[in-house]
Amino acid sequence: MRSIVLPSLALALFSQRARADTTLTIDPTSNWGTWEGWGVSLAWWAKAFGNRDDLASVFFSRNNQAVNGQTLPGLGFNIVRYNAGACSNNSYDGSTMVVSPNIKPSRQMDGFWLDWASSDPSSSSWNWNVDANQRAMLQKAKANGANIFELFSNSPMWWMCNNHNPSGSGSSDNLQSWNYQNHAVYLADIAQHAQQSWRIQFQSVEAFNEPSSSWWTAEGTQEGCHFDVSTMATVIGYLNTELSSRGLSSFVASSDENTYDLAISTWQGFNSSTRNIVKRINVHGYQDGGGRRDTLYSLASQAGKRLWNSEYGDSDASGKSMYQNLLLDFTWLHPTAWVYWQAIDGAGWGLIVGDNDNLTLSSASTKYFVLAQLTRHIRQGMQILTTPDVNTAVAYDAGSQKLVIVTANWGSAQTITFDLTRARTAGSNGATVPRWSTQTGGGDQYRSYTDTKINNGKFSASFSSGQVQTFEVSGVVLQ
């Protein structure tokens, strides 16, 4: 379900640089929106490592930070997705949580609402002291500069589930019909408690995670829950009411489908009332090179909705797959934010290699440094310009008159020339263009250079195969 199936056009664009040196022309008239930022989900890694100040610094600031003996450039994530857990180990009225035999303890996120005896969040049916590490990292992220927070759910509390198993029940709805509203109450109460007691204001609340998928089974490896589209619509209505009744400014985001095509189908299945409630469409990037990103963008744009790629992950530690899929998003999906899934994990998935159950850390993967090229330079508030090809992202900071270009070369070594002459002011002749280099095949991890000059609105740089570079051009006025 996570194989890479690139359409023929995208394959041609990815591979064309192998044939000849390239000139890329920047379009100063383009504008795909204001960038909201880069982010990460806290489940599951923060349950394990949420007490670590060094990890908070390396993920949420742009400071250089030593982690496990390796000095890393901070990624500067400003978006945090906090997970509302579904698990508890208590018994009530003869019922206890059913646990999948295949779920790791690190993936069982503690929930606050322990039983159905009372909906009063100040009662003994609630325990606000659980999930200490994830809550700690939430605070550390804020202290390091994170400023957009989302609350999301992978599954309702176990006792709201038909089979009392928060890992799911396959292709059938696992949320009990009499608990549709309670799932919304649970999320709204967390949002209210966070605002009052944690001083965290969730910009958005998401009640689902890949809800149309059928792989959320009782023997699954993580929390999950299938929702039919009609059930989603009902819960969305309840969630909007519960947030509003508490005087919260948090809005409803939906539906975090696994693929672009599922997101299209779900959105088209909502009636106008449900669409009016949803203020942002969240989608996951697990269709890799497939799917109609362009169609989903058109639907969101026509409806006046924001659009995020709210979760992406893959097992390619080199960062190449991530970069290619992310640039397809920039080319066709045009999200205003992009969120990685597991900051710490094994088997290529983690930006830093680690084991969330054994609490061990290794080193940063090459993927970490590839992502740093984007997150450290394309920053919140910048204007996103048209990609001159599917390997290149371009952003502009009007306040500092700085143009940021991030590009990768996956073919043979070559020289790439960047043409800024369509801009009103294309930098100063002879000015230095700082660049940062990551060589995915070995060499530079994240190294800065000052050996590039701009003349007559153009500059050139040599690229080895598998090299990602960022350039910052000062003194640029687009129009």
Curated annotation (Swiss-Prot):
Optimum pH is 4.3. Stable between pH 3.0 and 11.0 in the presence of BSA, and pH 4.0 and 9.5 in the absence of BSA. Residues 1-20 form the signal peptide. The keyword Ribonucleoprotein does not apply. The active site is at residues 210, 311. It catalyses: Endohydrolysis of (1->6)-beta-D-galactosidic linkages in arabinogalactan proteins and (1->3):(1->6)-beta-galactans to yield galactose and beta-(1->6)-galactaobiose as the final products. Its EC number is 3.2.1.164. This is Endo-beta-1,6-galactanase. It comes from Hypocrea rufa (Trichoderma viride).
